[in-house]
A protein has these predicted regions:
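Active-site-adjacent beta-strand/loop module that shapes the phosphate/pyrophosphate-binding cleft
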Residues: 94-121
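The catalytic Nudix box helix
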Residues: 57-90, 113
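NUDIX/MutT-family hydrolases
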Residues: 114, 123-155
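A conserved beta-turn-beta hairpin within the catalytic core of GNAT-like acetyltransferases
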Residues: 50-53
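Hydrophobic "anchor" residues
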Residues: 40-41, 122
Length: 163
């Protein structure tokens, strides 16, 4: 498990148990490296904070009573229009974002899965501005986080072993 931020911010109180900003507890999220048969990867441009306007892997928060696999399939469908086969877990990590005052503004525990598109047409859905198929060897224009690039690399290695 790794973390996206250093620093030891303190809890800010949050608006409720379900508030994403200044949460009382970490929020469980799911994400996916959706790899096509020709090896391209699905990326989405985030429409809301955190990461608004930035490219990332598709995903979102888990709903109460939802399994991790069902949650990732739902999020991919909502954000990209694709129906996917959910494969193995690629990694589990946290994303902790601290505000200028040192308080934890966002704290997510994220489970990323390798997925394969089964049907549907790629299009930007809810919570995203755009969705693209990208060459995983040419990701520089998307300015992905180091963690996103690492997860893509790990998923490609897993996909290569599964063939």
């Amino acid at each position: 498990m790794s973390t996206d931020s250093s620093g030891n911010g303190q809890a800010h109180g949050g608006n409720s148990d379900t508030s994403r900003r200044y949460p009382k507890r970490p929020i469980v999220g799911v994400g996916a490296v959706v790899l096509t048969e020709d090896g391209r990867v699905v990326l989405v441009k985030r429409g809301h904070a955190p990461l608004a306007g930035q490219w990332s892997l598709p995903g979102g928060t888990l709903e109460v009573g939802e399994s991790l696999e069902a949650g990732v399939a739902r999020e991919i469908r909502e954000e990209t229009g694709l129906i996917v086969d959910v494969g193995p877990l690629v990694g589990l990590f946290d994303r902790i974002l601290v505000d200028d005052g040192g308080a934890v503004e966002y704290h997510f525990v994220l489970a990323d899965y390798l997925c394969r598109p089964r049907q549907g047409r790629l299009e930007a859905g809810t919570d995203v501005e755009d969705a693209v198929l990208a060459d995983p060897d040419a990701l520089e224009p998307y300015r992905l986080t180091e963690k996103a690039r690492s997860v893509i690399s790990q998923a490609r290695a897993i996909a290569g072993r599964d063939r």
